[in-house]
A protein has these predicted regions:
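Feature for exported/extracytoplasmic and membrane-associated proteins, marking the mature portion
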Residues: 1-273, 291, 305-381
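Metal-dependent active-site segment of extracytoplasmic phospho-/sulfohydrolases and closely related
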Residues: 264, 268-295, 300
Length: 381
């Protein structure tokens, strides 16, 4: 296990080493952000089974260590995350604990604003850090895409971004599509939007199906279909919802984590050889209380867990300066205390993913919070 001090200090030499300049960013590399909306419980995902307070505070919510997927003598993955556990063993996943953004209150709306804009406080910044990341790369069409019904804040900004969400309706036939295209030809705005929509549909291809609601694995394959194309996007965001588990958490989280595992598996299968150049960040707006509540769930907390997954990831490690779960160690007598800034993790991962200067990347993505300047390299060279 690597602690925060090692994570931060080991890159002092890295900053002194020559870096590839901004204009030379490797655009065949791919970066995907999977957001867990609703405050995913990091203690239920990456389980600190060896902490003596864990089982006592979690009660019936505690995962039996005999069933958990043990990674070392301290942490285990939830038993639903078999695919991610395999990627960890293969050196293609790194796991981070006690992670938090600068936000310290407990509003989903405000916390997601901070997470997606890269600000220090809600509404300090108007555009999203992923859009600013796209602006650091050599310009190309179809540079970034959101897999969501509407464009998420993280991808809003000066750079044009596509969005795609599978429809529950049957596919329109080619004749109807042609008629609509002719109808919109005289309108500069609608014509452009329609062309973008048709291009997105074409990129989705046969994997999109047309049978309504897609499974997580199918969605992963559709997203991979976009990303794997030579002319496809290189930055993508996938929204997942349903992580706000105030009640019946044990069964709900088992389902949520199974879906996440299948989504990652779909991405890996669909990307094929492009998986080797792919980095996936999984993160949430904040964590949940250490102790279970009275309705079989947990309430809004502070620190949580995050993941970096992909063929490009220099994985097989857990990064955690573990604060402990004893009463004296908790934040506000209830929350896992954060020891690693999510902005530090994101900035370094993005710099590594696209071979950008780490200091400049941190300044562009997180201009107000000033994340730590250095860390060990997270991705393969």
């Amino acid at each position: 296990m690597l602690n925060r001090r090692g994570f931060i200090s080991s890159a002092a030499a890295l900053l002194a080493a020559p870096r590839i300049a901004f204009a030379g960013a490797e655009t065949e590399r791919r970066f995907v952000f999977i957001i867990q909306r609703g405050a995913a419980d990091g203690l239920h995902t990456l389980i600190p089974y060896a902490d003596p307070a864990y089982a006592r505070l979690r009660g019936a919510l505690a995962i039996d260590p005999a069933e958990a997927l043990k990674l070392d003598g301290t942490f285990a993955l939830h038993p639903s995350l078999t695919g991610i556990a395999d990627l960890y063993k293969a050196g293609q996943a790194s796991l981070f604990h006690a992670v938090a953004s600068p936000y310290r209150d407990r509003s989903h709306f405000d916390a997601q604003n901070v997470l997606e804009t890269g600000g220090k406080a809600p509404f300090d910044i108007k555009d999203g850090w992923m859009n600013r990341l796209a602006g650091m790369l050599p310009r190309r069409s179809n540079q970034a895409i959101a897999f969501a019904p509407t464009l998420p804040l993280a991808l809003r900004g000066a750079i044009d971004v596509a969005s795609y969400a599978p429809s529950g309706l049957p596919h329109a036939n080619d004749d109807l599509l042609l008629r609509v295209q002719k109808l919109y030809e005289g309108d500069a705005q609608l014509s452009g939007l329609w062309s973008t929509a048709l291009k997105a549909q074409g990129m989705a291809g046969a994997a999109a199906g047309g049978k309504g609601q897609q499974s997580p694995a199918e969605l992963g394959k559709v997203a991979a279909g976009f990303l794997a194309r030579a002319d496809g996007p290189r930055i993508a965001m996938i929204e997942t919802n349903g992580w706000d588990t105030h009640s019946a958490q044990k069964g709900r989280m088992a389902t949520q984590l199974t879906n996440l595992d299948n989504l990652i598996s779909g991405l890996q299968q669909g990307l094929g050889d492009a998986w080797r150049q792919t980095t996936i960040l999984v993160a949430t707006e904040f964590g949940r209380t250490v102790a279970a509540n009275g309705t079989g769930g947990t309430d809004h907390g502070t620190a949580s867990a995050a993941m970096l997954i992909g063929g490009a990831v220099k994985g097989g490690k857990i990064v955690a300066d573990w604060p402990g779960l004893a009463a004296a160690d908790l934040l506000d007598n209830r929350d896992l205390r954060p020891t690693l800034g999510l902005d530090t993790l994101v900035a370094q991962a993005c710099a590594d993913a696209f071979l950008l200067d780490p200091q400049r990347t941190a300044q562009v993505l997180f201009p107000d919070s000033r994340p730590d300047k250095a860390s060990s390299r997270l991705l393969r060279g």
